[in-house]
Swiss-Prot record:
Gene3D superfamilies the UniProt entry points to: 3.30.230.10, 3.30.70.240, Elongation Factor G (Translational Gtpase), domain 3, P-loop containing nucleotide triphosphate hydrolases, Translation factors
Organism of derivation: Synechococcus sp. (strain CC9902)
GO molecular function ontology, one term from the record: translation elongation factor activity
Sequence positions that bind GTP: 17-24, 81-85, 135-138
Domain tr-type G: 8-282
An individual GO BP term: ribosome disassembly
Taxonomy, superkingdom: Bacteria
Gene Ontology cellular-component annotations: cytoplasm
Name assigned to this protein: Elongation factor G
Keywords: Cytoplasm, Elongation factor, GTP-binding, Nucleotide-binding, Protein biosynthesis
Primary role: Catalyzes the GTP-dependent ribosomal translocation step during translation elongation. During this step, the ribosome changes from the pre-translocational (PRE) to the post-translocational (POST) state as the newly formed A-site-bound peptidyl-tRNA and P-site-bound deacylated tRNA move to the P and E sites, respectively. Catalyzes the coordinated movement of the two tRNA molecules, the mRNA and conformational changes in the ribosome.
Subcellular locations according to the entry: Cytoplasm
SMART domains: EFG_C, EFG_IV
Coiled coil start-end: none
């Protein structure tokens, strides 16, 4: 089938930012001006096209990454609108993994917020080229150049304005395009009647200064341009455009635009910039993967290359399970069979759809560079690779952060128990940061996630979508266990009870693993001293013990185990005996390896009037917090600190009463850190029964 849009005219972009920067409104306006919707939907009215879950429409925030296709100036633009709340970090993470470019939206008043830094780091992790839209220029206190300075200083970006606002706050009347050296004056409220004129006399000096700055920065992206600029001191408009594009694609430049999505000013220019400056799938390096023989390979963005795609999101849907895929190479046909190379299984593609928020269009095929969804995949989950069975490859998967907070869920009736298990399976398929376990001592179902809002929304969905009636416990911190030393461990399981006995014997060496490596098992058995069929059960026994912990019943992380010795009995040895022996050896080794308890440390940023600074810092210190920095700007103090999550429950209420309701704070997961001995002892003795 012929392509509707050649690959060089495809853009896969994300819109990302901190909460309340106006990201979803920007997406709505993009859909309005590009003709996908014929009426403007506002987030605060609960009418946004990309916010389609009931919880999103009620809360006015975006929770899941909605994928939508539109077109602009003969280009296909696939957009993912991502949430700004830190509890939904996985949604941003999974969209960054599959995008070719991103629009980072900043509030012209609030500027760079803690969550902006998180989103920026995620874009860095996947090397995503980006541009910036400084939104809300109509608001009191809007300052375009101040935000530009913050992006340079706090995000260490080579940010270059390619526009300037004409007026600000209530006086915002238009935008200067520094590339074309023209003014765009908005004549109506809908932002459709635009007059393009010369730069206003009063702004000529400022425009000249920033245009010279733009030329200098663009010249640095290319040797031929720098020569011309040094010779003539000028670059043509076309050279500027080409230079900006080269700089963006090579991560050397971040163009900064401005406007007000809510007031319908500047959105068409954002779309122009997406088409002009953000990369097509063929402009970014081809996706890398691993072949079955362990060698690295790449898949170019080409319909003729072998098929490969990444499942980046799974969603329960009234019509069945929807699996969102990013097509990297080849073509995917409706009705075909493909290989899930991550799990080593075949899957059938029942139907293919392209999404327009909660509206969908069925298609016969998806091609390289497309974002679409598949109906009918039974066993594919987030992060899995789909590929041609004849030419298998496993693509680099997603980074999934560890959950930091958990609550116990108790169904009210037996009927609710069945509904609950169905709901938990469905929600865990959709969201890799949502974990479910059974508490060994109490038998309760415990769910874990990225924060209180994350769990609140998941519980809300259980009750709404799956009609589960349940009692929810108080939030608990998700501690972890790890080791700080190395040692050998031995487990021998031997039982004679008449008839066939049980015998398994495992010897291991244990050492700390690489950060974020989880549990790593290495088989070093040689000469068949333990038969091959007993190696996997031994590993399984260790893995299960690792998941349920040894010292306090919390999952053990970042540990490397080598199975080095053991023995077996021709008649009495069994898989079960070796599974138990593996678990015994694991526990024995952990106890000798200086085990420690880890707790989630949160990056906390507090903004308060200057008068309250002393009380806030004192309070953070009393919560075992480490204050890392403070700054005062226009009478407002900003404090950044690392504080254990265990000490942060109820902080919002405490901060309100401490600052007469004038303090605000944001909190996101930073890292795991050793729990101080006296605190750890109390936690361990309380949880001893679980281990």
């Amino acid at each position: 089938m012929a392509r509707a849009f050649p690959l060089e005219r495809v853009r896969n972009i994300g819109i990302a930012a901190h909460i309340d920067a106006g990201k979803t409104t920007t997406t709505e306006r993009i859909l309005f001006y590009s003709g996908v919707v014929h009426k403007i939907g506002e987030v605060h009215d609960g009418a946004a096209v990309t916010d389609w879950m009931a919880q999103e429409r009620e809360r006015g925030i975006t929770i899941t990454a909605a994928a939508i296709s539109t077109s602009w100036k003969d280009h296909r633009v696939n957009i993912i609108d991502t949430p700004g709340h830190v509890d939904f970090t996985i949604e941003v993470e999974r969209s960054m993994r599959v995008l070719d470019g991103v629009i980072a939206v900043f509030c012209a008043v609030g500027g760079v917020q803690p969550q902006s830094e998180t989103v920026w780091r995620q874009a860095d992790r996947y090397s995503v080229p980006r541009m910036v839209f400084v939104n809300k220029m109509d608001r009191t206190g809007a300052d375009f150049l101040k935000v530009h300075g913050q992006i340079q200083d706090r995000l260490k970006a080579n940010a270059v304005p390619i526009q300037l606002p004409i007026g600000a706050e209530g006086e915002l009347s238009g935008i200067i395009d520094l590339v074309e050296n023209k003014a765009h004056i908005y004549k109506d409220d809908l932002g459709q009647d635009i007059e393009i004129t010369d730069v206003p006399e009063a702004m000529k000096d400022q425009v000249e200064e920033w245009r010279a700055f733009l030329m200098e920065k663009v010249a640095e992206t290319d040797e031929a341009l720098i020569e011309k600029f040094l010779d003539t001191g000028e670059l043509s408009n076309d050279e500027l455009k080409q230079g900006i594009r080269t700089g963006v694609v090579k991560h050397g430049l971040v163009p900064v635009l401005c406007g007000s999505a809510f007031k319908n000013k500047g959105v068409q220019l954002v779309l122009d910039a997406v088409v002009d400056y953000l990369p097509a799938p063929i402009d970014v390096p081809p996706i890398q993967g691993i072949l079955p023989d362990g060698t690295e390979a790449v898949r170019p963005s080409d319909d003729k290359a072998p098929f490969s795609a990444l499942a980046f999101k799974v969603m329960a849907d009234p019509y069945g399970k929807l699996t969102f895929v990013r097509m990297y190479s080849g073509v995917l046909e409706k009705g075909s069979y493909v290989m899930n190379s991550t799990k080593g299984i075949k899957e059938r593609i029942s139907r293919l759809v392209v999404l327009k928020a909660d509206d969908r269009e069925e298609v016969d095929q998806l091609q390289a560079g497309d974002l679409g969804a598949v109906l009918g995949l039974k066993n594919t989950t987030t992060g899995d690779t789909l590929c041609s069975a004849d030419e298998p490859i496993v693509l680099e998967t997603l980074f999934v952060p560890e959950p930091v907070i958990s609550v116990a869920v108790e169904p009210k009736t037996k009927g609710d128990m069945e509904k609950l298990s169905k709901a938990l399976v469905s929600l865990a398929e959709e969201d890799p940061t949502f974990r479910v376990r059974t508490d060994q001592e109490t038998g309760q179902t415990v769910i874990a996630g990225m924060g209180e809002l994350h769990l609140e929304i998941l519980v809300d969905r259980m009750m709404r979508e799956f009609k589960v009636e349940a009692n929810i416990g108080a939030p608990q911190v998700s501690y972890r266990e790890t080791i700080r030393g190395s040692s050998k461990g031995e487990g021998k399981f031997s039982r004679q009870t008449g008839g066939k006995g049980q015998y398994g014997h495992v010897v291991i060496e244990m050492e700390p693993g690489e950060p974020e490596s989880g549990f790593v098992f290495v088989n070093k058995i040689v000469g068949g001293i333990v038969p091959k069929e007993f190696i996997k059960p031994s590993e399984q026994g260790m893995k299960e013990t690792c998941e349920s912990g040894v010292i306090a019943g919390f999952p053990l992380i970042d540990v490397k185990v080598s199975m080095v010795d053991g023995s077996y009995h021709d008649v009495d040895s069994s898989e079960m005996a070796f599974k138990i022996a593996g678990s015994m050896a694991f526990k024995d080794a952990v106890r000798k390896c200086n085990p420690v308890l880890l707790e989630p440390m949160m990056k906390v940023e507090v903004e308060v009037p200057e008068d309250f600074l002393g009380s806030v810092i004192g309070d953070l210190s009393s919560r075992r917090g480490q204050v890392e920095g403070q700054a005062i700007d226009d009478g407002t103090s900003k404090v950044s600190a690392k504080v254990p999550l265990a000490e942060m429950f109820g902080y919002a209420t405490e901060l309100r009463s401490m600052t007469q309701g004038r303090g605000i704070f944001s909190m996101e997961f930073s890292h795991y850190e050793d729990v101080p001995r006296n605190v750890a002892e109390a936690i361990i003795s309380k949880n001893q029964g679980n281990s």
